[in-house]
UniProtKB/Swiss-Prot annotation:
It comes from the Bacteria. InterPro entries: Bax_inhibitor_1-related (IPR006214). This is Uncharacterized protein PM0402. GO terms for cellular component: plasma membrane. PANTHER family: BAX INHIBITOR-RELATED, MODULATOR OF FTSH PROTEASE YCCA. CDD domains: YccA_like. Pfam families: Bax1-I. It is a multi-pass membrane protein. Its main location: membrane. Keywords: Cell membrane, Membrane, Transmembrane, Transmembrane helix.
């Protein structure tokens, strides 16, 4: 009887994990599509790039709101508001590249982002490896990136920019590995929080690859 209860408990846990993973990827797909549409509208209307204060207020304000509402239906609306805002911020950035005939860099960054995401997801889902050991590395990288961004305000150096962008690529890649593993091992049971976490990693990854490819192309 006891072994049967344990087996039923494991089956229930496995079903819940699959449900969270399925819902996460479904919502992630919807938010990526929505963000792309908003970015396209932002580009078409030539909307200005938000200033630093608006960017920080919008990002962290909507992020906090989404996490606060993640256990309710309003969390989904907040998720779309958050990802839509990030889509809006992408519009002016992409316009700069397109207007300078650098659309190929945008495509390359997009392809690189997709490749990293699918490779990381496939690796974790195939191996079922527990990536919780990455948490310390991710935190350390966050501190280094924070210091690097502060330094970039005082030192205008292409090498510093490319170093920060390179670290962001590593940081975002590890974030995808960690969050995917966290879902399949039951560490994250809320698909809204999981979606936002992966979305932010993809956003940072895309922007970082754009910066790297742009700097490298200018040096040629």
């Amino acid at each position: 009887m006891e072994s049967r209860i344990v087996l039923d408990s494991r089956e229930t846990s496995l079903l819940n994990t699959h449900k969270v993973l399925r819902n996460t990827y479904f919502l992630l797909g919807l938010t990526l599509a929505f963000s792309a549409v908003v970015a396209y509208i932002s580009m078409s209307l030539n909307l200005p790039r938000p200033g630093l204060i608006l960017m920080l207020a919008g990002f962290y304000g909507l992020l906090f709101l989404t996490y606060k509402l993640s256990n309710s239906g309003l969390g989904i609306l907040s998720t779309f508001a958050f990802t839509g805002f990030l889509g809006y911020t992408l519009g002016p950035i992409l316009n700069v590249y397109v207007s300078h005939g650098a659309g190929d860099i945008v495509v390359l960054a997009l392809a690189g982002t997709a490749a990293v995401f699918f490779a990381c997801s496939a690796y974790v889902l195939t191996t079922k490896k527990d990536m919780s050991f990455l948490s310390g590395t991710i935190f350390a990288l966050f501190i280094v990136l924070l210091l690097g961004m502060v330094a970039s305000f005082f030192f205008q150096s292409p090498m510093l920019y490319i170093a920060i962008s390179g670290l962001f690529v590593v940081f975002s890649t590890l974030g995808i590995l960690y969050e995917t593993s966290n879902i399949i091992h039951g560490g994250e049971t809320n698909y809204i929080r999981a979606t936002v976490s992966i979305f932010v990693s993809l956003y940072n990854l895309f922007i970082s690859l754009l910066n790297i490819f742009s700097i490298l192309s200018n040096e040629d």
